[in-house]
Swiss-Prot record:
InterPro entries from the UniProt entry: ARM-like, ARM-type_fold, Armadillo, P115_Arm_rpt, Uso1_p115_C, Vesicle_P115, Vesicle_Uso1_P115_head
Protein encoded by which gene: Uso1
Biased composition (Acidic residues): 935-959
Species this protein is from: Mus musculus (Mouse)
Membrane topology term: Peripheral membrane protein
Entry protein name: General vesicular transport factor p115
Intracellular or extracellular location(s): Cytoplasm, Cytosol; Golgi apparatus membrane
Superkingdom, taxonomy of origin: Eukaryota
Region (Globular head): 1-637
ARM repeats, residue ranges: 20-60, 61-121, 123-163, 166-207, 208-253, 255-310, 311-354, 363-408, 420-459, 473-513, 518-571, 573-630
Chief location bin: cytoplasm
Residue ranges that the Swiss-Prot or TrEMBL entry lists as coiled coil: 638-930
Length: 959
């Protein structure tokens, strides 16, 4: 407290002493009065004094005010006065002091009083509990006080809230408050709470903050809303920026789709309010947070795809091509579109198809390039267009080819009715504006980045300099302008273009060296002792000459690697050359450009280096330095080693391709096996259905048998009078004929059964022979399992067939028994001595029963015939199943042979790869002995790839 009293020590003592006594008396009343009204009035008086006499009230009353919060929670009025007083003490928002240093002193007071307040973490917990009160006069001052604490000392207050039970959840309830002022101040509170604290950001996000904030933005009118929309957008940025977990949660929650209505602008775009411009600017920044190049590539790619699928990219392109858009919004929209399409092939293809609403329509890329090479356009807009063009070409070989194609003679519009991207780049490259030269050179370099094919294609470009003079190549024209001594920005841009063009392209190096004036110009530039401004150009010239040495294929006799190194040693000196080469990476603007891809410069004179070029310098600086110090013998040995390694790589690639082909063949064979299994299952299903049908016929036959037995019983009991009228012998003879027919059918069925038995014996013998052959053959581990499955299926089919045969035999036996009973009935002798009347009655009854018996016998014959036909159909299906099994056995034998051959080929490949690895190790050891560095990571990566392929081969053999 003594320290706090010393802050205001320079003030006069008279009136302040009186006020200090008043404050002391009020504090005594708050502490000692037993009446609630007295305490309330005292706290209200302290509140009125707290703004003007902040220091005195803070020193004397803070403890008493905290005690009031603890003991008088039942009275909302005194709680509200106490919270307002504490807010006035801690907050720096409202000041009435007029001294010069009042602002600095008030900030110190606020942080010091905040430190005193949070020294006891229970005070913050008490404040959080007060926020649960629904009373407006308690909740709103509590929100303001907690916000002020977070602004003064954010990290310690955040930590206290984080460890407090349900602390963050209580604050999230503020967003659902129906009173707008509390809800809006709750948004400000969450802004301060989530600033630079990833743990709290995650908790807030999982407390459904995204849903609530987006609802508020929609209710307020999206971009047409007021400052509440701005506050919500700032809070969303706090939650998403550099927080990969929340970004993934935002994408998977389908919240990206809800951003599309933000960018729906009408046809009338004039007269935008300042708040709308601010809101839309923050919305665009929020989109960029989700697709920032600094995010993990996988997360960025998924967000880019989601933005295309929901139409957000299309909406941004509409703003891009609209008229009447404010300049800063247009610039930020270009930057946003740039990062949405960067490295995403689908988005890049869509952007290439966008046309500007002009007559005739022009591609959006052409319209943007026209702005980039126009020196009257704002500098930030030109930088944004360059960034957009770079992002369009990033990892986009198709787009690179389309841009380079517009420079080739076959694609140039002879009528001159339309302007192509290539023509605009050439126009900017040879313009009198140095910034246009730099932008066009960097843009063209990005069209060649990592694309050897387009580097060779660009060598075909011919330029007509003037009427009557022959055309010159683009490469030659660049070197001509370089030698004319133009502005530094122009020369730096051309040198970056040439370095990108010649790197990893020996053909371009040959074309460059073919002009005899280029090498003397470079050596002359490097050898001179110039000022600091020219040192950067000297470093770039040294880099270009080093690239011409490192990527030289020695096709030009006068400019081989050895002769160029001798020239450097003679005219420049190796140490001097390496020193000049090091000027590039030591430059201040080089380190600034290497930090992020976006070309963001405060003014045009800082626009020197490109981000992708800094990566190229980092890659080539070391290898060029080593190449300069190498002798000719080392170069020859290195070339031999490179050739050997290339041959080895070709061999390994060839065998890898062979192994891949064999893997594909094995996969096809596996698919065939699975198809045959499916067919076998279908056959089993058919057999099951047939078995069920046989069971049905068997049941019907049993029913007929029972009925026939009853009829025979009645016929035996009444057969005594059959002979009286002479009818019984005729009927018996007819029955015997029917029985003979049944016997013939039985014989036919027995013959078919014998054929089936012989077929089963043949199948058993073939199965035994197949098992012996399979036992002697060497098959992959999985083939015996497949064969065993097929055998089990065959055994099941045979068992079903045997059961069906037994059932047919049983039916035949029962049929024979019925025939024997019929014959017994036919042989029975009638009894004499009955009267004619009784005989006539019995004869009539027997005739009726006999006719019924004949009818039943006829139906039985029909059923037996149907069973015979059904059995024949089953026999045919079984024959087809046997043929299918034979085909499967044949296919399996073929698979055995093919897998055996594949195993032998893979064994040969493994032996060959082992020999090649041994050769590589010996070559590496020789290289190390010669002092040549060996890239361990690449080689280990290749070895891992080889090991992976060998492991895959072993797995296939296991299959």
């Amino acid at each position: 407290m003594n320290f706090l009293r010393g802050v205001m020590g320079g003030q006069s003592a008279g009136p302040q002493h009186t006020e200090a006594e008043t404050i002391q008396k009020l504090c005594d009343r708050v502490a000692s009065s037993t009446l609630l009204d007295d305490r309330r009035n005292a706290v209200r008086a302290l509140k009125s004094l707290s703004k003007k006499y902040r220091l005195e009230v803070g020193i004397q009353a803070m403890e008493h005010l905290i005690h009031v919060l603890q003991t008088d929670r039942s009275d909302s009025e005194i709680i509200a006065y106490a919270l307002d007083t504490l807010y006035n003490i801690i907050s720096n928002d409202e000041e009435e002091e007029l001294e010069e240093n009042s602002t600095r002193q008030s900030e110190d007071l606020g942080s010091q009083f905040t430190e005193i307040f949070i020294k006891q973490p229970e005070n913050v917990t008490l404040l959080l509990s007060l926020l649960e009160e629904f009373d407006f006069h308690v909740r709103w001052p509590g929100v303001r006080l907690l916000t002020s604490l977070l602004k003064q000392l954010g990290p310690p207050v955040q930590q206290i809230i984080l460890v407090s039970p349900m602390g963050v959840s209580r604050l999230m309830d503020l967003l659902a408050d129906s009173r707008e002022i509390i809800r809006n101040d709750g948004v400000l509170l969450l802004q301060a709470l989530t600033r630079s604290n990833g743990a709290i950001q995650k908790i807030v996000a999982f407390e459904n903050a995204f849903e609530r904030l987006l609802d508020i933005i929609t209710e307020e009118g999206n971009s047409d809303g007021g400052i509440v929309v701005e506050d919500c957008l700032i809070l969303l940025q706090n939650l998403l920026k550099t927080n990969n977990s929340n970004q993934n949660f935002f994408k998977e929650g389908s919240y990206i789709q809800r951003m599309k209505p933000w960018f729906e602008v009408g046809e009338e775009n004039s007269g935008w309010s300042a708040q709308k411009v601010t809101n839309l600017h923050l919305m665009l920044q929020l989109v960029r947070v989700l697709v920032s190049p600094t995010n993990p590539p996988g997360a960025t790619s998924s967000c880019q795809k989601a933005m295309f699928q929901c139409g957000l990219l299309q909406q941004l392109c509409t703003i891009l091509m609209a008229t009447g858009i404010p300049a800063d919004i247009l610039t930020e929209t270009i930057n946003t579109v740039s990062e949405v399409i960067r490295g995403c092939q689908v988005n890049q293809d869509y952007f290439a198809s966008v046309n500007a609403p002009s007559n005739p329509p022009r591609p959006a890329i052409v319209v943007l390039l026209m702005s980039m090479v126009n020196e009257r356009q704002p500098f930030v807009l030109r930088c944004a267009v360059l960034y957009c063009f770079q992002c369009f070409l990033y990892k986009n070989e198709k787009g690179q080819g389309e841009i380079v194609a517009t420079l080739l003679p076959s694609t140039i519009d002879a009528t001159g009715n339309s302007v192509s991207a290539g023509q605009l780049l050439c126009g900017g490259l040879f313009s009198t504006d140095s910034l246009s030269n730099w932008c066009a050179a960097v843009a063209l370099a990005h069209a060649l980045q990592g694309n050897a094919t387009q580097k060779e294609q660009l060598l075909r470009v011919q330029l007509a300099t003037s009427i009557g003079n022959p055309p010159v190549s683009l490469l030659q024209q660049c070197t001509n302008i370089l030698s004319q001594g133009s502005k530094i920005q122009t020369r730096v841009g051309l040198l970056m273009l040439l370095c990108t063009w010649l790197s990893n392209c020996p053909i371009a190096v040959t074309h460059f060296l073919h002009n005899s004036a280029n090498v003397p110009f470079l050596t002359g530039q490097i050898a001179e002792n110039l000022g600091e401004e020219e040192q950067l150009v000297q470093g770039l010239c040294a880099l270009l000459l080093g690239i011409s040495i490192y990527f030289n294929d020695n096709s030009l006799e006068n400019y081989t690697k050895e002769k160029l190194k001798q020239l450097i040693e003679k005219r420049i000196g190796k140490e001097n050359f390496i020193e000049k080469l090091g000027f590039i990476s030591k430059h201040e603007l080089y380190s600034r450009a290497s930090q992020k891809p976006q070309p963001n410069f405060p003014s045009p004179e800082y626009m020197i280096f490109d981000h992708e070029f800094t990566k190229l310098v980092k890659e080539l600086e070391g290898v060029i330095t080593k190449a300069i110090y190498k002798s000719s013998e080392e170069d020859k040995k290195e070339e031999e080693v490179k050739k050997t390694l290339e041959q080895h790589d070709n061999i390994v690639t060839h065998y890898k391709n062979m192994i891949r082909e064999q893997d594909l063949q094995l996969e096809e064979l596996k698919q065939q096996v699975s198809t045959l299994k499916c067919q076998n299952e279908q056959l089993q299903t058919a057999v099951t259905q047939q078995a069920s049908q046989i069971q049905q016929h068997k049941d019907q036959y049993n029913l007929l048998k029972v009925q026939l037995g009853k009829d025979n019983h009645h016929q035996g009991s009444h057969g005594d009078g059959a002979q009286v009228n002479g009818i019984q012998p005729e009927e018996i003879s007819r029955l015997r004929e029917e029985i003979e027919e049944l016997k013939s059918q039985q014989a036919l069925l027995q013959g078919q059964l014998a054929e089936k038995d012989s077929l089963i014996e043949n199948l058993k013998s073939s199965q035994a022979s197949g098992m012996s052959e399979q036992a002697s053959a060497t098959c992959p581990p999985r083939d015996p399992e497949q064969v065993a499955e097929l055998k089990q299926e065959l055994t099941a089919l045979k068992s079903q067939l045997c059961s069906q045969s037994l059932e047919i035999t049983r039916l035949q036996t029962e049929n024979c028994e019925l025939l024997q009973r019929a014959e017994t009935l036919a042989k029975s002798v009638p009894v004499e001595g009955e009267s004619e009347h009784v005989s006539a009655a019995k004869t009539t009854d027997v005739e009726g029963r006999l006719s019924a018996l004949l009818q039943e016998t006829k139906e039985l014959k029909n059923e037996i015939k149907a069973l015979s036909e059904e059995r024949t159909a089953i026999q045919k299906q079984l024959d087809s199943s046997n043929s299918t099994i034979a085909i499967l056995q044949t296919e399996k034998d073929k698979l055995d042979l093919e897998v055996t051959d594949s195993k032998k080929e893979q064994d040969d490949l493994l032996v060959l790869l082992a020999d090649q690895d041994q050769k590589i190790l010996s070559l590496k050891s020789k290289l190390k002995d010669l002092g040549h560095p060996v890239e361990e990571e690449d080689e280990s990566g290749d070895q891992e790839d080889d090991d992976d392929e060998i492991d895959d081969g072993d797995k296939d053999q296991d299959i």
